Amino acid sequence: MKAHKIFWLNLAAIIIISIVVSGGMFLAMKWEQIHLKDGLKKVLSTYPIKNLETLYEIDGHDNPHYENNDQDTWYIESSYSVVGSDELLKEDRMLLKVDKNTHKITGEYDTTTNDRKDATDSTYKSYPVKVVNNKIVFTKDVKDPALKQKIENNQFLIQSGDLTSILNSNDLKVTHDPTTDYYNLSGKLSNDNPNVKQLKRRYNIPSNASTKVELKGMSDLKGNNHQDQKLYFYFSSPGKNQIIYKESLTYNKLSEH
């Protein structure tokens, strides 16, 4: 009888210890997510950058992936893609190069269209642009008035979005490597998120499309300055092609050596 009692006491102790340990781990993980979100909020609070020309005076992380003749430069890129089951059907892309040395912003707006029935039938067009007084203007004449208006009215989320609102979602996971300063955020966003609303309105995306978000970048999470980052929005509707919006801000610093 005594042995039987000891057995149940030991079992109860094991269960209690397991609950305490599991609860402690859960609280530790939850606290870590709160801490990382607070750090990301400091980074995202540096946006929006309403005037792109202010980037002339802003430094960021050095990015080693660009050629030596493209230094002291911010690169801003966005793309809107329609993707079928296994192929790209349509993509509009804007790429701007913000040269901190010459105080000039130049780039191009590209459009790509692929025929699903004929893989060899692909249409690609590129339109050179520049930014003057925070407005996108063409460096060559464009005869299509609708396309001209579309490109001239183009804005990046880093200009007009509410990036900190992404952190309000309860369905997010954030990771951060303090040795490299790389971070990653992924999860789902509701249709009430202002960035989701803006993109759906801009690109005529179905209102009921579900939205997944991913944010990658490099930062110490202290919000000291603007950091390299890549932002992805994935819109999915049953029976519809997937729509992907990407936006990135990267920096390459002139070496002092």
Swiss-Prot record:
**Which segments cross the bilayer?**
6-26
Keywords from the named record: Cell membrane, Membrane, Transmembrane, Transmembrane helix
Domain of life, per the record? Bacteria
Q: InterPro entries per the record?
A: Csa, Csa_sf
**What is the membrane topology listed in the Swiss-Prot or TrEMBL record?**
Single-pass membrane protein
Which cysteines bridge via disulfide bonds? none
Q: Does the keyword Cell membrane apply?
A: yes
Q: Name one GO cellular component term.
A: plasma membrane
Q: Where in the cell is it found?
A: Cell membrane
Q: Does the keyword Transcription regulation apply?
A: no
What family is reported?
A: Belongs to the staphylococcal tandem lipoprotein family.
Could you identify this protein by its name? Uncharacterized protein SA0203
The organism encoding this protein is Staphylococcus aureus (strain N315)
